[in-house]
Amino acid sequence: MLHLLREADASHMRSMEVDLTSEEQQAFLATPEDPIGVLLQTSKRVETKRLLLNHVMLALTADMLDFLYDGLIALSKRKYVVGFALLRKPLRETLFYLSLLLSDEEEFFRLFENGPAHGLRLREFRPDQRKSIFSGAINAMLIDDLFSATHLNDTVFDKSNPNGLAILFDQANHLVTSFNANLKTDSLNFNFVFKNPEDDDVFHTTYPQLAYALMYMFGIVTSLFSRTLPIDREYVGRLVLIMFAVYHSLFCRGSSGLLRQINLAFGELLKCSVCEMPFVIRKSNAPRFFVAERMVCKRCGSDTDFPILWLLGQAKLSFAKPADASPR
């Protein structure tokens, strides 16, 4: 996602050249404090709107990644309050607005132009509206419909979900909470103040939800940027497949149908480079295989290097939608 931001800056998505009539030029020069507002009233409204949406997309994505990085670093250091306080904005607010932008660009711009303080406050959106926006964004992605709008809403917004992130967001920002039984601060306690940083229970309940939200975020950002940048949807689809393979290995119970499918597709390509012993991707070795692109042979002990993206290309495995697929 950071690479996409660099590509966007290099492509001059933030600038444009326009030819205005003499009357439009006079209006533009007479209102130097609001050039965008003036341009929106000219014959170049469509171009100006595209420029403004590009600015919004880039600024929101950059801000989201800044908070996300610092939040994840804080969690890795077991600074729970700081981590969840920082993650609240990118996951609860920014990601929702980017979802709306991908789902319905016209509606997003209408609300943005009329005043975000009125139409874009989170409290203005009911749960069913949020789910509808998430569904629209999922449908508009470059990749297959892999995510659940209900699960996203319940994870990020539902304060009655004991396994969601919404409770932790509130507890990290407030010493005392009382919304419901799940959120109510216990007697003789303050939220997180007396939490033992060595306890791992927070990671057990939140990392699966964070991983799911981050995969969704990747789908949103790549799909939005594809509207203005040339993006290889097959490459994106293979990256998402790798993410889901690791996610299944780390967080899903029982056997993984996805790993079985990958093993079958790779076939004879998956073998030791020294003794040619066939390899099988299992939950125990899948994270290292897909992230480090290596697997240790149980027969000879050699550590074989595998070019994962090349293998996926040879096996024709990808979660990308066909190029001619229209949103359903």
Predicted region positions:
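Short non-catalytic regulatory patches outside canonical folded cores
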Residues: 46, 50-57, 69-159
